[in-house]
């Protein structure tokens, strides 16, 4: 397993994302490069739970190396990692691809587990804003359906949990088979999908108390 934490920084005007290249979904933002790296490392333990579910060992300590800085865009400043790294254009080696897809699957498992134990009504912000549990889940699932289209995977609107599982299985299969067709690079797609799932799984956890 990688022990050096290779990170690329996605630098928007208002937000900077620190993205762990070898660990899809482990992406956090702050207002400066240094703060974004600190925020990334602050989530090491939480991301470690995902690695355990995937059967992958996350090293306890990391030698952080920033390998690239890319300009962010409006989506970066909105709060989502939006710009691929240059290395994403290179095909992932088979073991790395399998490992990263397993981490994506583990993020789905974590979200399902968190949702199953969360209250239906989540704690709101100071002005009463924010989604409740089921609305968060609906948002994640619909976003995934849109993301999947960027890889050539098209599914009609969901009518049951089985439809969600089928779409996710097809998405993982397409990524593993190298059959993805669309504007998103596979490495970036795995990172973005996994980040979105984890960001909302952690949101549900944080707002369940």
Residue ranges and their predicted role:
Residues 64-67, 132, 163:
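Charge-rich, acidic-biased intrinsically disordered regions
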Residues 6-8, 14-33, 37-56, 101, ...:
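Short, contiguous alpha-helical
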Residues 93-105, 116-117, 122-123:
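Long amphipathic alpha-helical segments with strong coiled-coil/leucine-zipper propensity
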Residues 36, 103-106, 110, 166, ...:
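A non-catalytic, amphipathic alpha-helix used as a structural packing/dimerization or gating element
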Residues 171-178:
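Transmembrane alpha-helical segments of integral membrane proteins
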Residues 45-96:
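Short, charged, surface-exposed hinge/linker loops at domain edges
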């Amino acid at each position: 397993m990688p022990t050096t934490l290779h990170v690329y920084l996605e630098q928007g005007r208002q937000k900077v994302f620190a993205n762990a290249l070898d660990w899809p979904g482990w992406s956090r933002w702050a207002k400066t490069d240094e703060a974004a790296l600190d925020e990334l490392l602050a989530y090491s333990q939480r991301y470690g739970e995902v690695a355990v579910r995937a059967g992958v060992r996350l090293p306890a300590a990391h030698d952080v190396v920033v390998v690239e800085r890319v300009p962010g865009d409006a989506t970066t400043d909105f709060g989502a990692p939006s710009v691929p790294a240059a290395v994403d254009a290179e095909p992932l080696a088979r073991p790395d691809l399998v490992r990263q897809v397993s981490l994506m699957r583990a993020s789905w498992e974590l979200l399902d587990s968190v949702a199953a134990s969360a209250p239906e009504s989540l704690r709101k912000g100071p002005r009463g804003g924010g989604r409740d549990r089921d609305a968060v889940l609906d948002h994640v699932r619909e976003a995934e359906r849109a993301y999947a289209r960027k890889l050539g995977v098209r599914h009609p609107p969901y009518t049951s949990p089985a439809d969600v599982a089928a779409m996710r299985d097809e998405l993982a299969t397409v990524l593993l088979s190298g059959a993805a067709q669309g504007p998103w690079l596979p490495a970036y797609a795995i990172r973005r999908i996994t980040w979105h799932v984890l960001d909302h799984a952690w949101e549900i956890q944080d707002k369940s108390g």
